[in-house]
């Protein structure tokens, strides 16, 4: 794809407009309310393109269910597969575990992990640094996180049930 059409590498202020105009579908390819629609995504990082464009477009076909299969595992941390983003909150997997923690009354875990991460940064020897954020993910199964990601990438007006499956 031309770099101007790559929604992932587009600047933040231009991404929302671009994702609404890059993709389209072939109508009449499935039986409305009967067929499930399976798509493959190379990776789900922010979830923006899925939520604001792809799932909306696919929902126009009125499938019974949309299954999004990611050929990559859940992208949970910066600098994974060359993805270098500075804010954990940009990652849909991170937003999913934060929502799960809040839903289950476990907000204290967020503060505990934050304190541990700050303490790690203050250590003199960075060669022994521990990624404390893993503790946030460890409280949930991959399936629980994937189910929450499916909720996040599904806009309220979507009629089809959406499921997200990772490699």
Region annotations inferred by a language model:
Residues 1-167:
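PRPP-associated nucleotide enzymes
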């Amino acid at each position: 794809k031309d770099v101007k059409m790559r929604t992932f590498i587009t600047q933040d202020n231009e991404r929302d407009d671009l994702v609404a105009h890059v993709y389209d579908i072939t109508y009449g390819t499935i039986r409305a309310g009967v067929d499930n629609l399976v798509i493959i995504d190379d990776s789900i990082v922010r979830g923006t393109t899925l939520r604001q464009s792809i799932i909306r477009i696919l929902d126009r076909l009125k499938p019974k269910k949309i299954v999004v299969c990611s050929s990559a595992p859940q992208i949970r941390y910066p600098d994974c597969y060359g993805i270098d983003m500075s804010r954990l909150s940009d990652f849909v997997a991170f937003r999913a575990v934060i929502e799960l923690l809040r839903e289950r009354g476990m907000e204290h875990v967020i503060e505990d992990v934050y304190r541990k991460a700050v303490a790690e940064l203050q250590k003199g020897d960075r060669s022994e640094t521990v990624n404390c954020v893993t503790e946030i993910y460890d409280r949930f199964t991959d399936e629980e996180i994937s189910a929450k990601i499916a909720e996040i990438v599904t806009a309220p007006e979507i009629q089809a049930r959406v499921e997200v499956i990772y490699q």
